[in-house]
UniProtKB/Swiss-Prot annotation:
It catalyses: RNA(n) + a ribonucleoside 5'-triphosphate = RNA(n+1) + diphosphate. SUPFAM superfamilies: DNA/RNA polymerases. Readthrough of the terminator UAG occurs at position 203. Coiled coil: none annotated. It is an enzyme of class 2 (transferase). Residues 424-544 form the RdRp catalytic domain. This is RNA-directed RNA polymerase. It comes from Tobacco necrosis virus (strain D) (TNV-D). The lineage of its organism: Viruses, Riboviria, Orthornavirae, Kitrinoviricota, Tolucaviricetes. Transmembrane segments: none annotated. Its EC number is 2.7.7.48. RNA-dependent RNA polymerase that plays an essential role in the virus replication. Keywords: Nucleotide-binding, Nucleotidyltransferase, RNA suppression of termination, RNA-directed RNA polymerase, Transferase, Viral RNA replication.
Length: 725
């Protein structure tokens, strides 16, 4: 307080000099413009003067700061009289005391506010350490301090006053911070580090690995005939960029007899229960009859339609699919569709497998039917799909089906959905191997809905076509053998109605469950097939969870219910989470998916032209997808851009277009947006990566090297392994 006159005198003298300068200018140039500018400038200077005086000379600022430092020193590891950082209640020297009106609420003693702020700051810094003084880190500390005070039961009005003080205390360096900085910058440290020799730049390259066949051979389901052949001669290839610091490894399954057999056994016929295989569970007889209320409500919004002509159906497709279906249409003009066209042609899906998480997963098989069958079913269902999705949205009272939305649209829809609740929580629902658990009863329930959309004159033909999806016959030809099989029910991955049918069944089951719980008036669902996020009020969470797994068991499904989340950014949906980017929410892919999976390719990259085309396409798409997103934008800027124009219609162009299948595509042009402080905070909420860690990762990226190497490069330890991202 003694310095107040000096500060005021200094500021007043500056203001007098500025005012005199302005008056001189006005006298010399007495024009309207000059007078106007002078008045504006004078008002601005006056405002800044008053504001600066108010902030600089706040009577409690210096005293409070010094008190905080003393408290930190009293509880320092270097103090022999250190006091434990524990918040007690009711004691003479306690920071908190019970509220006279409510015992479950605590108030902060006026004489102990600084002490309490420092203790809370200790807890926050114990979690994340000393962070740089930035707006993003201020938000991090603010959230941690607020959560700690809520845990203590502090009165909300006191929390509002205490959080700013606690946040300010978080940014005060401790004695140990000064000591550590002195050690790092000391001459002794430099001398010892010099003994290590020069630090070489990490080098990496493109490593080629072969596909594999699972060693697991178990289960003996009825309806499957296996014929062995010669050994597999040509395995698949997986290309991976090494030396990038990513710790997740991927592999690829070969299209082999062993992989097809295990895929059919464990993804079609049987499920694993306590380490043993058992037949896939069936629903309780009549279980799907309880969905009639949802079907009745949906029918109000579901319009009637008619079958498309072959030409109209072909209008939905381009490229290779158009060529394939065009040939099928020409064939159907010669010979009508028959049941044999619905038989399955089975092969192992070529996909990147996270073998770090699961070294020996069951292979995923693709089971398409003949294009002739798809054309005939598609003439009924291809255009009806969008009508169904709109009807489901109306039945739920808002956007429910998220298929076809861009990442920006999906993020804003999640924000709107979340804001429609007073105190929302999200419950993730994961139906284990959903396609496998789609029973005959579930298919018949779905087919009944499709039939209701068409006139009686067309229902018989549609019913005949759909009935061939219930009793299935399949053939898998592999280089080392073949498998013939029969199965009742199950969803086949190549069917025209796989996506829409799964959406309908999942939405019906969720709506039926929530609608039958008493006193739940508001619930919303985000659905993309078997991937669901149910949002309800916090007060309804226990009622929704109670009995949910058992309910799905009666329907023949094995449902896994994820832990409840109460922060928008922590909603997990299709391996993406909402992140605030450039003022709006956008669905951002999981860090590990982006920074590990995208460094692998199933395309043949032996030639330099193929490598350059692939890396350019992935980098261009990744930068566009993550423009303005912390870490990920800089990660994809590592990918070289060779400014190549891949010839349209070529195999490489088609493969690149098919391979870049982010579930939430983004078409905006790359603008190289700089992540805002709010984005860094939102990114931390979503993936657990602190703003300082984000910046450290970004500073460590360097351009990819495209040379093929014959041995694996040692990976560097990544912050992602410890950040909880």
């Amino acid at each position: 307080m003694e310095s107040l006159p000096i500060v005021l005198l200094s500021l007043i003298s500056k203001a007098v000099v500025l005012i005199c300068s302005l008056l001189t200018l006005i006298i010399q140039n007495s024009t309207a413009v000059t007078w106007g500018l002078a008045c504006v400038w004078l008002a601005y200077v006056s405002f800044r003067f008053l504001f600066q005086v108010k902030i600089t000379v706040h009577p409690a600022a210096r005293e409070t700061f010094e008190s905080m430092v003393r408290k930190f020193q009293a509880e320092s590891m270097f103090s022999e009289e250190a006091t434990p950082c524990i918040v007690s209640v009711g004691d003479k020297d306690a920071d908190l005391t019970p509220d006279p009106q409510r015992e479950d609420i605590k108030i902060v003693k006026s004489s102990r506010r600084v002490s309490y702020a420092v203790r809370v700051a200790h807890v926050a810094k114990a979690q994340v350490g000393l962070l740089a003084n930035s707006r993003a880190n201020e938000l991090v500390y603010s959230r941690l301090c607020r959560e700690e005070m809520v845990k203590h039961g502090v009165r909300p009005s006191h929390i509002a006053h205490m959080v700013p003080l606690a946040v300010a205390a978080c940014f005060i360096p401790l004695d140990s911070d000064f000591l550590a900085a002195s050690i790092r910058q000391g001459e002794g440290m430099r001398e010892r580090r010099a003994l290590l020799g020069p630090s070489w730049e990490k080098x990496g390259g493109l490593l080629v690995t072969s596909g594999f066949t699972t060693p697991t051979w178990r289960g003996d389901p009825r309806g499957m005939l296996v014929t062995k052949g010669p050994p597999l001669a040509k395995p698949r290839k997986l290309y991976r960029f090494t030396g990038m610091g990513t710790h997740i490894r991927y592999g690829v399954h070969d299209h082999s007899l062993g992989n097809v057999r295990r895929g059919l056994v464990e993804r079609l016929y049987m499920v694993e229960v306590k380490g043993e295989l058992q037949p896939t569970p069936k629903p309780t007889p009549g279980a799907f009859n309880q969905m009639s209320r949802f079907s009745d409500r949906l029918s109000i919004h579901l319009p009637k339609t008619t079958r498309l002509t072959p030409r109209e159906f072909l209008g939905f497709y381009t490229g290779r699919k158009l060529e394939r279906y065009q040939k099928a249409v020409e064939s159907l003009e010669m010979h009508p569709v028959r049941e044999k066209d619905a038989w399955l042609s089975t092969f192992v899906k070529a996909e990147k497998l996270n073998i770090t998480a699961k070294p020996d997963p069951a292979p995923r098989v693709i089971q398409p039917r003949d294009p002739r069958y798809n054309v005939e079913v598609g003439r009924f269902l291809r255009h009806s799909e969008e009508m169904l999705f709109k009807a489901i949205n109306k039945t739920f009272g808002g956007r429910t089906i998220f298929k076809g939305l861009s990442s920006d649209q999906a993020g804003e829809e999640f924000k709107t959905l979340w804001d429609s609740f007073k105190d929302p929580v999200g419950i993730g629902m994961d139906a284990s191997r959903f396609d496998q658990h789609i029973s005959k009863d579930a298919l018949e329930f779905e087919h009944k809905m499709w039939l209701s959309m068409f006139p009686k004159s067309e229902r018989a033909e549609l019913a005949r076509l759909l009935s061939w999806q219930i009793n299935n016959r399949g053939l898998a030809r592999c280089p080392d053998g073949e498998i013939r099989y029969r199965v009742e029910g199950c969803r086949m991955s190549g069917d025209m109605n796989t996506s829409s049918g799964n959406c309908y069944i999942m939405c019906a089951t969720v709506h039926n469950w929530c609608d039958n719980i008493k006193h739940i008036k508001h619930f919303r669902l985000a659905n993309n097939g078997d991937d669901c996020m149910l949002v309800v009020e916090r007060s309804d969470e226990k009622k929704v969870r109670n009995g949910l797994i058992e309910y799905y068991a009666t329907l023949g499904f094995t449902m896994k219910v994820e832990p409840t989340v109460d922060v928008l950014e922590r909603l997990e949906f299709c391996q993406t989470r909402p992140v605030l980017v450039d003022g709006k929410y956008r669905m951002v892919r999981n860090l590990h998916q982006s920074m590990s999976k995208d460094l692998h390719s199933l395309h043949d990259l032996d030639s330099s032209a193929a490598r350059n085309a692939w890396v350019t396409a992935v980098g261009t798409g990744g930068r566009c997808m993550n423009d303005g997103v912390p870490v990920l934008k800089e990660f994809f800027k590592q990918f070289p851009d060779y400014n190549l124009e891949v010839k349209k219609g070529s195999d490489m162009a088609q493969k690149l277009r098919d391979d870049w299948k982010y579930k939430f595509n983004r078409t905006a042009a790359f603008q190289d947006l700089i992540p805002t402080q709010e984005s860094r905070y939102s990114f931390w909420l979503a993936f657990g990566l602190l703003p300082d860690e984000q910046i450290a990762l970004e500073n460590g990226f360097s351009p990819l090297k495209m040379e093929i190497v014959n041995e694996q490069i040692q990976e560097e330890t990544s912050l992602l392994q410890f950040s909880g991202a």
